[in-house]
């Protein structure tokens, strides 16, 4: 590959709306160009990186026994009506009509098409299990596309759908795909975590996300120092609290005239924030509920919604609070409410003694509160809080928080989609059985941006070697003025390629400083300079992308350094 024959257009300027490092660097390196909001053209350079990722994904999917197919990106409304997702998916589903006024959608995912294909093709349990995958563009009509290809409307995705007769076999393939994903992200050279996750709108029983670790990540993750346990903060749980200690204080009323937050009350009383309890008033269709979490903790909305009877909860308004507690926000508590109410206590609160709560009287709090003496034991005890850094993990380690970018997700869907589309097979007894289904997605274009977020410096991208557009670029000084140097550089390029090294020759004739800056911006792992001085000495100037300085190597030393 000669860069004089390759479209490479780098820039120093970055559009003001490029917020993320990956967006800025991809634009500066000329990897992508914006066509419209959330729509990007991938340049030859960007496409080389994209294809490197795609190739590794395809190899590992094939290795895992999945079979490649290609579903239409445009799918009929009838399929999506059958699963209820035509309306449920909301505004992100791009809906279109053809000339006959028939309705279709540009699909963001392909569970319906996969289940319909399975219904048409699979008749007997003897054909199972089967796992079909595709690498295909998808479209989500994001309200606010941003961050370049990180949250574009059109994106490249690998999505796979497996079909099974039993839950046990579905679980087996789920583990198989999870192992394949670990191999994929390991081969890509990325630091990542597989985390427990909520299934969200796609549904299903078991779910794991794969996150590339990056400070700019939108998701907060918790992982244990004691094992490979990791989870999205939405679903992460700490270890059970220690048993409740015995009561040691008497109940007292204290004036807190202007102290409405746990932080202010703790400061006034000279107590640790962990001794206070936060009371959150909510309403459900069944009535008023008071949710209790420790003062230094926050309610986890997802966990709370999964508590029995809480699926439809909302925050109570001031009128409802006065009716049930006879007070106002800032002074609420579970002791002697104005009316009988349901109380949900977080596990940590249920294990507390001598704690502080609002007194249900303006300007007053209670100290030395104890379960069973000053108020009944909580009706419901559940894990309803977000974990915090330093929490004790169930495996004995400590939980640490980090941030990540979701790049993959695996689900056990069960029979949800197959049942809706009547995808059945004849079982061993000749009876119709609804197939079980698994779903496994990887955001291929998103991986490219996530890798840059994790791997960059002030000069540009620092690609993991498997993702780099080239492993090495040979830079030739003054190729048009020195035919001998140009010929030597061309010979070196051919030798590198013959040795199986992915190499390119920068023969564009740029000044050395501009050429080297481009190579750093592009993140090429290795740079070799061919010059008149080096040829006279029988050496090449070599520098790794992450090295502080260059060194002179003979050809044998160069090939040794490049791993051949």
Curated annotation (Swiss-Prot):
Keywords recorded for this protein, A-Z: Aminoacyl-tRNA synthetase, ATP-binding, Cytoplasm, Ligase, Nucleotide-binding, Protein biosynthesis
Cross-referenced Gene3D superfamilies: Anticodon-binding domain, Bira Bifunctional Protein, Domain 2, YbaK/aminoacyl-tRNA synthetase-associated domain
Xref: InterPro entries: aa-tRNA-synt_IIb, aa-tRNA-synth_II, aa-tRNA-synth_II/BPL/LPL, Anticodon-bd, Anticodon-bd_dom_sf, Pro-tRNA-ligase_IIa, Pro-tRNA-synth_IIa_bac-type, Pro-tRNA-Synthase_IIa_type1
Zinc-finger found in the keyword field: no
Subcellular location field: Cytoplasm
UniProt cross-references to PROSITE patterns, sorted A to Z: AA_TRNA_LIGASE_II
Substrates-to-products reaction catalysed: tRNA(Pro) + L-proline + ATP = L-prolyl-tRNA(Pro) + AMP + diphosphate
Summary of the function given for this chain in its UniProt record: Catalyzes the attachment of proline to tRNA(Pro) in a two-step reaction: proline is first activated by ATP to form Pro-AMP and then transferred to the acceptor end of tRNA(Pro). As ProRS can inadvertently accommodate and process non-cognate amino acids such as alanine and cysteine, to avoid such errors it has two additional distinct editing activities against alanine. One activity is designated as 'pretransfer' editing and involves the tRNA(Pro)-independent hydrolysis of activated Ala-AMP.
Family: Belongs to the class-II aminoacyl-tRNA synthetase family. ProS type 1 subfamily.
Subunit and partners: Homodimer.
The protein's name: Proline--tRNA ligase
Organism per entry: Xanthomonas campestris pv. campestris (strain ATCC 33913 / DSM 3586 / NCPPB 528 / LMG 568 / P 25)
Gene this chain is encoded by: proS
